[in-house]
Amino acid sequence: MDMLKENVIQNNEARTESSVEPSHPDMMETVPEEQQKPISHIDDLLSETANLMAVKEQLLKEIAENEHIHSMQMRALQNLPQEAILPLQYHADPRRRHRMQKPESYKTVICQAWLESKTCAFAENCRFAHGEEELRPSLIEARQNNKYRTKLCDKYTTTGLCPYGKRCLFIHPDNGPNAYIRADKLFEVSQRHALADLRDQMEHHIMNGGRSTAGPQQFDMFARPCTPDEPAANMPLGPTPVSIRGPRYELPSKKPLETEEAGNRPPSSWPLDPSTFFALDSLNMATRPISPFESMLIGAAGNMQYSMLGKQSTPGGVSGYSSSGSTPSQDSDSSPLTAASAAADAACQANSESAQSILLKSINNPMIGNETTLPIPGLDQLAMDIAKHLELW
């Protein structure tokens, strides 16, 4: 440092001596004052250079220490198991930390997509609740918010749906029996959920090959849909906020004899199953009023049980009938009334298991068992006419 300073001073003196020649006696007095200014400037530069060099040495020491610490950390991580390394990497990445699910809000709010149509693209991986069964208690008190109940809820007032329900921080005007859905939207949403349940039931039925995997089951397709005339307050609420259903009807349970017969034929194709058509008396439909067409058939058939003409509840609203393949050729003197009378007489004998099995055999296998009984002529056309008339009635 001293040698550098001496060299700089000598160079400056040589420059000043060569450039300044004393031509006047007064100039000799001003030269020493002008030479003092570059010398002081050089001193400042030298001090700054010394400071920078000291800072550089300090930084080099810190870098060496950091490298040593980093090497020690890497050695320690190599000795840790893989299960302990993954959480550390997850928290070290700020992008992953931003995408972390907040545990305090998991499953504390109803899923908006599920609330609208009971369908969600995330399915079981959704972080929101699909129904009140999955809803968890919130760890945050709503009243701690300064905006609690100070303005109207935008979702509830505009769309009619709010996934927060009673936990919403805002006001739900005209709150009906359901805190999640506005009263005028309740029927529309219930129909969407009913269609979703029906789709799930049909998919389950198709996956099982048309066979029931358990005992008697209740199907949503028999559920009575709520009508707009019913007040929203009287609609029954299920376990989920929009599970609105009416009374359900069950299929008649098969008797042991019918179970044996089912093994000798293809799987049931409900509602075209003959057993469901001729076992309508088990649905207890005797309280329904008689249509004019049915009264005409009753008068022509004589002592015919009314349960034979009971209307079966089907998803389409059309009475079920049996389609047993091609109908045998009718006699020249046979008529629809004669066929109805024969069908009624056969149905009256269904109280005994033996008579009912004979009737089912004659319908399912019209070409077999001619010694026992003959197939009823015109049964398909008669059943179709009855179904159309009952649907119009």
Swiss-Prot record:
Q: Which GO terms describe its biological process?
A: establishment of chromosome localization; meiotic nuclear membrane disassembly; negative regulation of meiotic cell cycle process involved in oocyte maturation; negative regulation of ovulation; negative regulation of translation; oocyte growth; oocyte maturation; oocyte morphogenesis
Q: What is the protein name given in its UniProt record? A: CCCH-type zinc finger protein oma-2
- Write down which residues bear the modification named Phosphothreonine: T327
Q: What does this protein do?
A: Zinc-finger RNA-binding protein that binds to 5'-UA[AU]-3' motifs in the 3'-UTR of maternal mRNAs to suppress translation in oocytes and embryos. Acts redundantly with oma-1 to control the temporal expression and distribution of maternal proteins and thereby promote meiotic progression, oocyte maturation, fertilization and embryonic development. Also, together with oma-1, is involved in P-granule distribution during embryonic development.
Composition-biased stretches (Low complexity): 313-340
Compositional bias ranges of the Basic and acidic residues kind: 14-26
Any one Gene Ontology cellular component term annotated for this protein: ribonucleoprotein complex
* Any one Pfam family match given in the protein's UniProt record, by short name: zf-CCCH
Q: What is the effect of changing C162Y?
A: In te50; sterile
Record organism: Caenorhabditis elegans
Gene Ontology terms for molecular function: mRNA 3'-UTR binding; mRNA regulatory element binding translation repressor activity; zinc ion binding
Q: Tell me the compartments it is located in.
A: Cytoplasm; Cytoplasmic granule; Cytoplasm, Cytoskeleton, Microtubule organizing center, Centrosome
Outcome recorded upon mutating T327A: Reduced phosphorylation by GSK3
Which key words tag this protein in UniProt? Cytoplasm, Cytoskeleton, Metal-binding, Phosphoprotein, Repeat, Repressor, Ribonucleoprotein, RNA-binding, Translation regulation, Zinc, Zinc-finger
Disordered as annotated region, ranges: 1-26, 227-251, 311-340
Instruction: List the C3H1-type ZnF regions, as residue ranges.
Output: 105-133, 147-175
For the null mutant, the annotation states: No visible phenotype. Double knockout with oma-1 results in sterility due to an oocyte maturation defect. The oocyte maturation defect is due to a meiotic defect in oocytes in which the maturation process is initiated, but there is no progression beyond the prophase stage of meiosis and therefore the cell division process is not completed. Animals also have a larger number of oocytes which are larger in size, but the oocytes cannot be fertilized and accumulate within the gonad.
Q: In which tissues is it expressed?
A: Exclusively expressed in the hermaphrodite gonad. Expression only in cellulized oocytes. Widely distributed throughout gonadal oocytes from the mitotic stage to the developing diakinesis stage.
What InterPro entries does UniProt report for this protein, alphabetically?
ZFP36-like, Znf_CCCH, Znf_CCCH_sf
Q: Specify where it is mainly localized.
A: cytoplasm
Domain of life where this protein originates: Eukaryota
Q: Does the keyword Zinc apply?
A: yes
